[in-house]
Amino acid sequence: MQIRYLLALSLLPKLVLADESPATSASQCLIEPPVPRIVSQPGLSAADQAKIRIASDRSKAEMGKQAIFTGDVVFSQGDRHIAADEAILDQATEQFDANGNLVFQDSNFTVTADSLQAQMRSNRATLTGAQYWLHGQQVHGDAEKLQITINNNLILTNTNFTTCPPDNVSWLLEAEKIKINSEEEWGEIWNAKLRVADIPVFYIPYMTVPVSDKRKTGFLYPSFSTSTTNGFEVSAPYYWNIAPEYDLTFTPNYMTNRGLFTKTEFRYLAGEAQNGRLNLEYLGSDQMLNGSPNRYLYNWQHQGAIDKNWRVLANFTEVSDNNYFNDLKSDVNRATDNQLSRIGEVSYFERDWDISTRVQDIKVLGEDEKPYQVMPQVNFNYRAADFWNNLDFGFNSELTNFAHQDDDVNTATRLHMAPSLTLPIHGPSGSFTSQLKLMQTNYWQEKNNSKFDSLDDTVSRTIPQVRINGQINFERFTELFEHNYRQTLEPQFQYLYVGYEDQRGIGIYDTAQLQDDYFGLFRDRRFSGLDRIADANQVTLGITTRLFDDHNQEATKFSLGQIFYLQDSKLGYEDNIFEQNQSTSVLAAELDTRLSSNWYLGAAIQYDTNTSDNKKTEVTLDFRPEANKLLQFSYRYVPDLLNSNTNDLVNISQAGVRGAWPINDSLYFVGNWYYDLNETRSIETYTGVQYESCCYAIRLSYHYRIKTNYDDNIGSTIIDEREQFESGVYLNLIIKGLGGSGPLGVSDMLNDGLFNYRKPLYLRN
């Protein structure tokens, strides 16, 4: 005889929610049932697992009628057990009743109840006066009645549950009815009331919750916030599980100062190796702006592979106005982003060659001058290692058509080809690489305005390049500050010759000057893009030294380098791109060091030895005694930086401090403060306090930040009428077991602001 209801009862672990993450089910938070666990006999065969064993002090049975068991009754089948004072089995109707100190256990949960009534023929069972505990988790609760239906679903009546310890129930969810669908692994809750500190704080007439990682249509948990710009905000996301490969999340977000802001995110899988996302955001009649304009965003992202050789990529974003990201919390970009990238690319790869075609359009928010559009660009690259007598052969080419939204701006088609021969020599003591390259570029330009008459209709530019790069590795053992180290000394040099061609007849389509940091000193270009290839006859000298401790961990890295120009660049005189021709570049230095077991220093400087001017400085000092403790001081200085909002040159001189520190085992503090030394004002302040217990986590945070405002291209609001600063208070609450898997985490608090936390060290550990 098989007691099938025992199998049905094993569904009870899916009673309320999916398993908590390991971090939230630590041993100190586990809640064990008050009854002893019955340990199953290990090593049973499948046949033995299916057998039913009944033990009791007394029994009375008659064939085909009732069997009565009394006194310490124990029914066992595999790892499932029922203990009771009394049990009656009606063999004719297959009705099984048990009562008196009733306990049901399996490997997943324990249930105590006043009585059990089970109909084995229909696979139904009812437990009254039930209390349940999930093994290895924190979930436990009561139910006046617990029913197992014919479809192995669960129905709990007048029930409650919590993840808090019994002696300190911080929160409790009471419900008139909970229904668990075992097939869809989803729960429905009716007339739920959330109690916090035994005070009812929230009533939910109906809600759905997942009881596994399986996706299911339903409302997600709401969120609340407030700020000086948007007022009080409340959002209530709705998730729609359309199909295994499609889903959609719709989030209505109401802001008291602006109105109803809706977000829609559609995600999809296309085959086994492609995926994408579509975002639509809309705010109708923004009440904060003059004229109450409509504001919107749409974004499409797609990426993936087709077979083993093809790759596809797409990213397109459009917004209604320049200040969209600055005013509204978008799911696509951050408030500091002012560029919208629109890219479509298809690539094909083989071992020795690849080909790709790409279209690109970049929209810069707040700028009247629009960048050129790449419509399209085709790239072909070929490489052959050890092509002939240890020589590597390479061939890079591109064909690009530059278009523009304005009809009176010149456009062009550019063809570039660059074959190269490289002789690489590598060894443990160093490397020596020689390269010859010939760069051939052709332009066909359309002059759509008389101000571009100086440009040539067609251009053929041929520029040779010679590049020789070498590095030597020295090593020794030394003692510094009473510590033993292995020190390396890595001098590096590069000779670069690039021929000269008059390029005044070529327009500027995708070219900008590159930064002269230490690694930039060893580039073969001064500019990105191909519209300007600066002639060069120069030598770069650099040196890097590293210290490794007894555990072969890199403790310090210091690099210093500079370019020495053997000949002035003629390109600077023609295009006024360089301020003046100098005999040397900036002196670039970078330092990363572990000062002690807890203190770390990172610094970089670019110093103009010709004018004795500091061109750029960045310094960070970190104190990290433990993984969850951080204190960081930072400073950065950048002179003559172009403000894209006003087209003025500004000096950036900013200092900041950032900290993350546990006050005790449950309370955590995170904060940052950044100050503009030139403007003598704070540009961002963020303070957050987070408390976490075994059953809930709460975070209270405050932020104050400067806003990067642009002239609105919608409505009639001018930049002077917009708020320069924004402040707000945020309250986040996670009730563990009620849609949150906790903890809230610290990394997102560190990155919740204008300035993300950046670990400054790049030591090779």
From Swiss-Prot:
Matching InterPro entries: LipoPS_assembly_LptD, LptD, LptD_C, OstA-like_N
Main location: membrane
Record's keyword terms, sorted: Cell outer membrane, Membrane, Signal
Subcellular location, record wording: Cell outer membrane
Function as written in the Swiss-Prot or TrEMBL entry: Together with LptE, is involved in the assembly of lipopolysaccharide (LPS) at the surface of the outer membrane.
Subunit organization: Component of the lipopolysaccharide transport and assembly complex. Interacts with LptE and LptA.
Protein name (database record): LPS-assembly protein LptD
